[in-house]
Amino acid sequence: MNSKVLITYCWNRVGYNIMRSLAAHDIDVYVADTSKRNICSMSKFVKGGYVYPDPFKEEEGFIKRLLEIIDHLRPEVLLPTHDESLVIAKNRDKFPSWLIIPVASYRLLADLSDKQISTSIAASLQVPTPHIFHNVEDVKSFPVVFKATVSNSAKDVYFPDSIEELLDLIHRYEGKKTLIQEKCKGCDFSVDCVRGKDFFQASVYRALVTKTEGGGTTTQRVIVDYPELVDYSKRILDKVDYLGVCGMDFKVDEETGQIGFIEINARYTGGLATPIAAGFDIPYIHYCLYTGKTFNRDIKIRIGTKTKWLLGDVITLVGRLVSFKLSRKELSQLLDFDFDAFDDFRKDDKRAILGEMSYYFEKLIKNRKLNP
């Protein structure tokens, strides 16, 4: 009998690439999400799908529903993929002792998700970090970065150009934890890591296109060789003894070589398709490390591998057109289809992208936003 894995937060391309990775190794993959129709539920590789309440608005109902699914399905592994990891880790003692949940402790996940705490950890390890302004009076030049200490996908991140804009943001976010930092120049680089008790492997990709201006969610990426960023990432994970999958984001000024640490994503990251396409099968390695299965540790990552998120580029194009901020160079890049793989489309599974499009369309109608 094949092993069963239940994956949560499966509306997007990340869950899709995890599902494909595990299914390729004859693992029966079941998915669960707040939505019934999405990229995973319409894939031919899924064995079954479930719906649960919003984990961030209905925590008790979410956990209760997960327990019902687990009791019915009896999976070997419950695999959280995004910020619901925190909710599951917080309630870990409510799950059966035989169930493998490959995430860190709630306390560690919460600390690493906090940009102020993670930046302090990085700075203590001599990892280059942007300067933090503790008082508005200390800001002498603009733009700066103003952001909530806990957020994702470039949400709640702003680049005020004046003291008036900054003060307005401070007023709007009164009572919430926020951070003011110097704005780093350069391009987004991300380090995808897997760390076990006797294992560490990482790959680095450079962003070619980001969905929002100033960085954030990437829609096109290329694998690069950047040992310095890998070393910085390993320092941080070793320091906190983090086990599992993790992403580190940096800004790099390629003209000066100046590096700036941005954040830690103590979970699977949006660019997951890129390392997988390059030969670094992160989901399967993660699964093996926690289940005791063997895998090929002679990992050869193919530098230069490029991937593209098709729907993400469409959303990016629309967003740039609406805001009148589309350059000829970026238009040419968005219309490029010369890639090694696509995040959300495979010829052997054409229906899946229809599920993704359906999900985004429903969110657009409901929320009037292109960033769900």
Where are these regions (language model features)?
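Peripheral (often C-terminal) accessory segments that flank ATP-dependent C-N-forming ligase machineries
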Residues: 288-372
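Glycine-/Pro-rich loop/turn segments that contact NAD(P) or position catalytic residues
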Residues: 96, 107-128
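ATP-grasp fold ATP-binding core
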Residues: 122, 131-134, 140-159, 175-186, ...
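Short acidic-hydrophobic, aromatic-tinged amphipathic segments that line or gate anion-handling sites
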Residues: 49-57, 131-135, 158-161
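ATP-binding N-terminal substructure of ATP-dependent carboxylate-amine bond-forming enzymes
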Residues: 1-103, 357-371
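Phosphate-binding site of ATP-dependent enzymes
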Residues: 161-236, 240-241, 251-252, 258-260
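Structural element of the ATP-grasp superfamily
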Residues: 118-123, 180, 233, 286
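Active-site "cap" helix and flanking loop/linker of ATP-utilizing ligase/carboxylase catalytic domains
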Residues: 228-248, 252, 266-317
